[in-house]
Amino acid sequence: TKVSLKQKLDIKKNEIYIFNKNLNDLIKENIILKSKKNKYFLNTNLDLYLGKFIQNPKGYGFVDELFIPPRNINTALDGDIVAVRIRQENDTIEGEIISILKRNTNTIVGTYIQKKGDKFGFVIADSERIISDIYIPNGNSLNAKSYDKVIVQIQRYAEGTKKMVGKVIEVLGFKNEIGVDYLSVINEYKINNKFSAKTKNQIEKIPDKIKDSELKNRKDLTDMCIFTIDGIDSKDLDDAISIEKITKNQYRLGVHIADVSHYVKEDSPLDKEAFNRGTSVYLIDKVIPMLPKKLSNNLCSLNPLETRLSLSVFMNINSNGTVTKYEICESYISSKSKLYYENVNKYFDNLEELKVDETIKETEMEEKIKQSLSYAKELSLILKKKRQKRGALDFQLDECKIKLNEYDKPISVEVNERGISNKIIEEFMIVTNEVVAEHFNNLKIPFVYRIHESPKEEKLSTFLNFIKNLGYEMPVNFSPKTLQSILDDIKGKPEEATVSLILLQAMQQAKYYQDELGHFGLATTYYSHFTSPIRRYPDLQIHRIIKDYLNKNLSSVKLERYKKKVVNTAVVSSKKERLAQKAEEDYERIKKCEFMEDKIGQKFTGVITSISKTNIKVLLPNTVEGIIYIKANDQEGNYKILQENCSVENPLGKRYVVGDNIEVKLKNVSVDEKIILFELV
């Protein structure tokens, strides 16, 4: 029906007119058929396909796996919902976009250009997936100057040879001004960095202190040796831990998570805003929080020596890593110290004294924390060994750490070292998420799960061919365990980072879902996100469900409501997570380019991470990646591909293989295009 079509395509009120027009046009063209009962069907006789168009920066695109050459795009933009006619010529199958059902883009962030003497201008989009520029007629520029970053509202989409026409609705500032790149990124990905008046009003009404009445029916854990371990700049402390050894072969692990749902009531202005944000966004030294700071950095944050409301999971875990008993309960805690990853790692390596809160220094509690850390290290290694045994994938990929000065310019780019304390918290959060997911899956209660489906056959085949070309044996059977054995084989070898990266690219993206379908990467049947409700909405949503279950408040009416809520939460939160990841990656790429700008002409040693007919990608030890342009296997080509995606030969007969360490010289940097260009030495 028309109603179900609108729901499926997520048609907003301001899109109804164009939706109706497009639908009527498709009916006239006999592409969509309308029945007497006002139901709509795709004309199956026309070999048509409906889907989302994904634009490649090189000009071509895809609708799902169907290739769309540049000549057949028909003015579609990245993300548009389109109707495609499938064509087959000889052995080639490709698509032609014949109609655009729903436009995905109505505003574009980019750089305004106006040539001297012209009364009009145009905007070059920041997104590499918006290939054509936007024409800005006289009077539509909002007084923007050349090289200003602007937000453009599309007034007319491209038709035939006519360009898109737009109107500047906001000038963000000159492109090199402090903070303009940040504003460009958050506007590009529609990330809201301001809270509504209704939300602010609700926050102001929340008391600054916890009342005694709020502690009723909760376990008092304030005397326990509970502490947090976080990054030195972290202010939103979601999780705290406690641990003791109850027998020679048995640990009792407590994971205590901020009770955000106590403050964020369902369907309140605060809840609606958190739902729409979906996640906190971390742009190097800037945080766009899911929740206002009064909650994220104060009332909900498990700050030391402050009474905080929490949800606790206690687990008895034996020396094999098996959870033999567990309890989920509402609680309140008082963290005894805020520890930092960097310091705890050095403490384990006997390089520094443990830095605890001054109030417990040289007390019995300090000794308890040190003993707890010793137990935590033991248990984390047990849990990791168990995960590895079942085949959980451990990608050997470095994360970067970028430091900015007061002018937002990068002063260092380096590998973010992860030590034993990082791995302790990671293992403890994983086992907690597994326990919670399995418990509520067994209860058959509506829930939000974190799922990771197995790789699609085509992408996995590409990866397996790649490792075969590198000389590794192809596995006979396919499972997480066999893939992890490949990662184990390459550990410490030059191609380690590359193989990990290509395997990661072969994986499907993890997402939120209302049914438990397992987590391929972790090789586990049950998984959820429970441990970060300050910064992730799915965690907040399942906290509500858990608390209603614990308090026996799950009426049939509420269960029905939750059934719908978890579906909506999973869809929207997955989408918001992708946008946040893209924004974080984009901002990181910009800052890496800025860091390299003043190093043109300098030489570097890096590792080859990929080879194609057009370029060789090179990764430097500090995680900066650049490309070397080449031409291979065509009439003008002076390079020869020896093995697809693996090796290439230059005109002098020198071979370059993925994983090789090579010396390169920095040739050029384009911050606007986010490209770092090397040349071979």
Describe the residue ranges of each PLM region.
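Charge-lined substrate channels and their catalytic hotspots, especially those that engage the 3′ end
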Residues: T1-G254, S261-T307, K338, E352, ...
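Electropositive polyanion-binding surfaces
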Residues: Q7, S146, R156-A158, S184-I191, ...
